[in-house]
Amino acid sequence: MHTNKARPSRRTALTLGTAAALSLGGGTAHALPATGGVTARLRDLEREHTARLGVYARNVRTGRTVAYRADELFPMASVFKTLAAAAVLRDLDRDGEFLARRIHYTQAYVTKSGYSPVTKDHVATGMTVGELCDATIRFSDNTAGNLLLKELGGPTAITRFARSTGDPVTRLDRWEPELNSAEPWRVTDTTTPRAIGLTYARLVLGDALEPRDRARLTDWLLRNTTSLERFRKGLPADWLLADKTGGGQYGSNNDVGITWPPDGPPIVMSVLTTQPEEDAPADNPLVAGAAALLAAELA
């Protein structure tokens, strides 16, 4: 249901951080489970779409939580790109000048990386690190993501970064686009809905980053362009959304982020999905439908 309430501003979202995070707690210790009805509706949604659906969502003020397959492993896909940009901000941009560094790359590198809607147009000039962060989060540009991974020391730098923020599960092992193969038996390049949801919360609402870096990362997420048919489709139009999507083989289709209702506290939201067939298409209505259920339950 859409309302006519005033949409919260980006400035509001960028200043709510630490205060809102006081209710994040340590994962499950302070969580208040939501009603069984929403779990049943998520199960019905999963069956309707013949998929595996994983959900973690939490109202950071009340602690009320929805968890469905929240501790099962799912392919991470491009939701790692938020962690890559965050790691660059925290570990490489200490003097505030690293984001201005220009990185050069070849057309062959773009071709090898796969989907690259931004970097493909800047082969001749290269791009700054800041521009690469913007491209990989807002447009899910694979070349930009790989170049950031290269600066960080490779995919396993994301695993180390996740551990340093208190995430014991999330791991990255391969580069784009190989990391999206998403075989059901694979434990590499995976996360869980709870783990990645809480990591995003620590980055956007908590103190995992310095205030300047948190504001910059949040701004990129607020201006994401890839979730129009996923979270954005399922949430009321007047809710602010800072998120990152991802997708791969076996119908893997993810959306993770923070959303702000007009008159309420932030809600952490993580929806990860897979399907049984390798060539299954992404099921955006499944992700959007889950987001709608979570919004109705936790607002």
Question: Model-found features: residue ranges?
Answer:
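Flexible glycine/proline-enriched surface loops and loop-helix/loop-strand junctions
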Residues: A67-A70, T128-L132, F139-A144, E176-P184, ...
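Active-site-proximal beta-strand/loop segments in catalytic clefts of secreted hydrolases
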Residues: R58-V60, Q107, I137-S140, W175, ...
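Beta-lactamase-like hydrolase cores
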Residues: A29-P75, L294-E297
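Structured C-terminal helix/loop/strand segments within mature extracytoplasmic catalytic/sensor domains
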Residues: H2-A19, A34-L42, E151, T199-L228, ...
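Active-site SXXK
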Residues: G63, P75-Y105, T136, M269
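Conserved catalytic neighborhood of penicillin-recognizing serine enzymes
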Residues: Y109-L147, P155
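Extracytoplasmic
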Residues: T50-R52, R69-D71, V79, A100, ...
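Mid-domain, small-residue-enriched loop/turn segments at the edges of structured enzyme/sensor domains
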Residues: H49-R52, N146-L205
